């Protein structure tokens, strides 16, 4: 016997593959099992029983066509004697009296019969009658291989296994049920008519365990059972759902690129149809070649004495019936293949629309898919459309964002966020969130927060809950794309005062920020296009009715004309141009009310003429430009309110004498230039409180320095001073005196008259001793005295102790 288990390897496959087997494939599979059983049964009979039985024909014949075996059909079956064959003549019209019958003697032994049987089986029996069961087995195995080839082929099986694995996890995920129930609940509030249809589908009645209805509806029951626990999703389940979203994205990107699965399925179906047609034709033609009586002619006279035989094919009757049965099964199998082809070509299987799922669930952003991804979903629908519905949840960005939000809320509770609160230099209580996948809802429970900084937070969505942050004044968006809902924008529009936006791409600038009418400070940091027409972010500032401070750190070639939209209330305007030459500054003339102007790293070679028309200007900062001369400084006398002038980090070689015209100057910063001489006219600016001339090439300090009776800060470090005039110590209000990195050999004892001195820097000079009069500087402490330790030890003990006192 041939054990059927030997054929198990040809039909064995993973049970999970059943979701990709529509009804016609299942029917075809069972038909192949039936055909395989027919073939195996025939092969078993062929191997275990006699194939053919032959008897000699006493009439000699040279060829097979001359052998007449028709009398065997008319005679009764043979007797039990194997060597004798008794023939009974047919009855005649006139009955003759009974007579004794005698058989024919063939004078052949058993070996001769076996030899003749084998010779006639090989030469006289038609090949179809001999190999019919083997052909059935072979053809059936080919059908089985064709039907399951795409489950085994490496290029397709990997995708199928991956898809089935993801599909099962998506179906069983608690997040699937929760997302469907939440969205359906929201949809029911907006669309009562949809509520009834969704409830009828999802809210099936609970059947008792073991009831027949439970067995009939396993998937619906499972959905209902999960709905009861859908409201609770722990952290582990949330992480698993998050991983599923990533897997679905990668799988979709990988599978939608080609149509290998569709092509393989179609080719194997076409191959099955072609094979079906071929097998049907030749079987229908040759089934008549199976005969019960077979004439045989072999040249065996020398061995047996006979050359013609009449043979009986013992299994002919059974094989003919099996062949007809096989053809019937084959016909049904062929019909399933033809229907498969009809299904393949009738419908657009390379496109799959979730329109019905979107309408039913209310999740409106589920995308349609194509190519192989669409094809496998069509197959899944033939098994159970509920799989596609639950799988669609993991294609929705809305669903993913809700899950991300839920995971964020688990990871960042309000107490944990409060631990991250810090004070900014301005004294505000700030919460800094860095590299989060979103904005946790728990942020809006920290009501004491005054400043919120979001750095590299992906897709931050500011919900209406922001209205709970009643103390929120400042918002910082650093490489972060932030979106706001309408209610959120209405609140921010009236409450947000300070906004900072740092971006690498201009698309990261949210356009809603230009509608914040209560905004007082706007700081933009990032690269903008040189063509301002391509900068939609700066198209209009007209809505910023309260803007007082505007800072742009970018690479502008000219000042945006839209700055004029806020000219009526702008008080401070700053441009940090990062080394890009600022060519056009005509727009500055419109900023008549500006009090502070900063043009940093703009590659300016002279003081811009547009500045001189700013009559309300109080602070001018031209840091890190390429100024070589400042002869135009005389025109600054038109800026009558100018009190702070910062020309630091430039290449200025001298100070023009007409600087004396700037009578209102209170701060002058000329540090890090190339100044050699300080003109005495500078000290006619007798309102100076802050004078910084550090890191220049100054060798002498004019005695007129004593005129500056209001001076509180004097920076002369990093020069070539060898001596200090005694008049310097007439500046009784000096609080900070920086003399480090010079060539001073001593410090005048008159330094003791500087009773307000808080900070004194002397490190890097050529002094041997310090005057004991430092003890008279009652405001000076050791922490404010910057000097070498060895030089400090030259002071008397009592002076040192006094300086060390708190």
Swiss-Prot record:
It holds the Pfam family Pannexin_like. Residues 1-22, 152-275, 345-806 are cytoplasmic. The chain crosses the membrane at residues 23-43, 131-151, 276-296, 324-344. The keyword Disulfide bond applies. Disulfide bonds join 54-311. Keywords: Cell membrane, Disulfide bond, Endoplasmic reticulum, Glycoprotein, Ion channel, Ion transport, Leucine-rich repeat, Lysosome, Membrane, Repeat, Transmembrane, Transmembrane helix, Transport. This is Volume-regulated anion channel subunit LRRC8E. It comes from Xenopus tropicalis.
């Amino acid at each position: 016997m041939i054990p059927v288990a030997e054929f198990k390897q040809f039909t064995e496959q993973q049970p999970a593959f059943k979701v990709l087997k529509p009804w016609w494939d299942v029917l075809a599979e069972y038909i192949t099992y039936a055909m395989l059983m027919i073939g195996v049964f025939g092969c078993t009979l062929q191997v275990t029983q006699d194939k053919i039985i032959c008897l000699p024909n006493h009439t000699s014949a040279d060829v097979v066509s001359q052998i007449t075996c028709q009398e065997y059909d008319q005679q009764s079956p043979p007797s039990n004697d194997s060597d004798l064959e008794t023939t009974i003549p047919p009855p005649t019209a006139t009955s003759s009296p009974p007579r004794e019958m005698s058989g024919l003697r063939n004078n052949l032994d058993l070996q001769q019969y076996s030899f003749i049987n084998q010779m006639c089986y090989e030469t006289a029996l038609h090949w179809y009658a001999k190999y019919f069961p083997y052909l059935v087995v072979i053809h059936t195995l080919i059908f089985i291989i064709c039907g399951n080839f795409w489950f085994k082929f490496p290029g397709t099986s990997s995708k199928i296994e991956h898809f089935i694995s993801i599909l099962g996890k998506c179906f069983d995920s608690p997040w699937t049920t929760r997302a469907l129930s939440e969205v359906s609940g929201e949809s029911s509030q907006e669309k009562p008519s949809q509520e009834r249809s969704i409830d009828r589908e999802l809210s099936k009645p609970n059947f008792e365990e073991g009831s027949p209805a439970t067995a009939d509806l396993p998937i619906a029951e499972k959905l209902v059972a999960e709905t009861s626990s859908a409201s609770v999703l722990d952290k582990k389940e949330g992480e698993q759902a998050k991983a599923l979203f990533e897997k679905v994205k990668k799988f979709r990107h990988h599978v939608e690129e080609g149509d290998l699965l569709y092509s393989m399925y179609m080719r194997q179906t076409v191959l099955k149809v072609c094979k079906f047609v071929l097998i049907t034709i030749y079987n229908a033609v040759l089934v008549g070649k199976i005969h019960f009586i077979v004439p045989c002619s072999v040249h065996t006279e020398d061995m047996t004495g006979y050359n013609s035989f009449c043979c009986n094919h013992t299994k002919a009757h059974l094989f003919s019936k099996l062949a007809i049965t096989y053809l019937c099964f084959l016909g049904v199998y062929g019909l399933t293949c033809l229907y498969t082809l009809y299904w393949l070509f009738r419908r657009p299987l390379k496109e799959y629309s979730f329109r019905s799922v979107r309408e039913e669930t209310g999740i409106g952003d589920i995308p349609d898919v194509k190519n192989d991804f669409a094809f496998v979903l069509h197959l899944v629908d033939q098994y159970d459309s509920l799989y596609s519905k639950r799988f669609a949840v993991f294609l929705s960005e809305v669903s993913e964002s809700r899950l991300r939000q839920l995971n964020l809320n688990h990871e960042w509770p309000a107490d944990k966020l409060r631990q991250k609160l810090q004070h900014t230099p301005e004294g505000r209580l700030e919460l800094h969130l860095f590299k989060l996948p979103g904005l946790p809802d728990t942020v809006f429970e920290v009501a004491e927060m005054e400043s919120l900084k979001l750095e590299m937070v992906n897709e931050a969505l500011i919900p209406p809950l922001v209205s709970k942050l009643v103390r929120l004044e400042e918002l910082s968006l650093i490489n972060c794309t932030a979106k706001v809902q309408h209610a959120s924008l209405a609140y921010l529009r009236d409450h947000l005062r300070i906004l900072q936006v740092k971006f690498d791409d201009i698309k990261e600038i949210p356009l809603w920020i230009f509608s914040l009418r209560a905004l007082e400070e706007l700081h933009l940091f990032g690269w903008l296009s040189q063509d301002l027409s391509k900068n939609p972010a700066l198209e209009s500032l007209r809505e910023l009715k309260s803007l007082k401070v505007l800072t742009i750190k970018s690479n502008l070639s000219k000042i945006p004309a839209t700055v004029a939209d806020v000219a009526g209330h702008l008080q401070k305007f700053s441009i940090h141009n990062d080394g890009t030459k600022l060519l056009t500054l005509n727009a500055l003339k419109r900023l008549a009310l500006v009090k502070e102007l900063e043009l940093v790293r703009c590659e300016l070679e002279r003081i811009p003429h547009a500045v001189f028309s700013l009559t309300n200007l109080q602070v001018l900062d031209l840091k890190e430009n390429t100024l070589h001369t400042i002869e135009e400084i005389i025109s600054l006398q038109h800026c009558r309110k100018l009190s702070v002038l910062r020309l630091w980090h430039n290449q200025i070689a001298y100070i023009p004498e007409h600087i004396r015209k700037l009578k209102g100057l209170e701060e002058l910063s000329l540090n890090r230039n190339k100044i050699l001489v300080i003109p005495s006219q500078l000290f006619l600016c007798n309102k100076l409180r802050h004078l910084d001339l550090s890191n220049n090439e100054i060798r002498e300090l004019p005695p007129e320095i004593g005129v500056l009776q209001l001076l509180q800060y004097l920076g002369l470090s990093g020069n070539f001073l060898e001596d200090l005039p005694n008049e310097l110590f007439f500046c009784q209000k000096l609080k900070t005196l920086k003399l480090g990195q010079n060539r001073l050999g001593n410090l005048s004892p008159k330094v003791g008259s500087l009773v307000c001195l808080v900070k004194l820097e002397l490190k890097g000079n050529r002094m041997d001793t310090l005057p004991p009069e430092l003890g008279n500087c009652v405001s000076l402490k050791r922490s404010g005295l910057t000097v070498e330790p060895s030089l400090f030890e030259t002071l008397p003990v009592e002076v040192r102790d006094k300086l060390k006192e708190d």
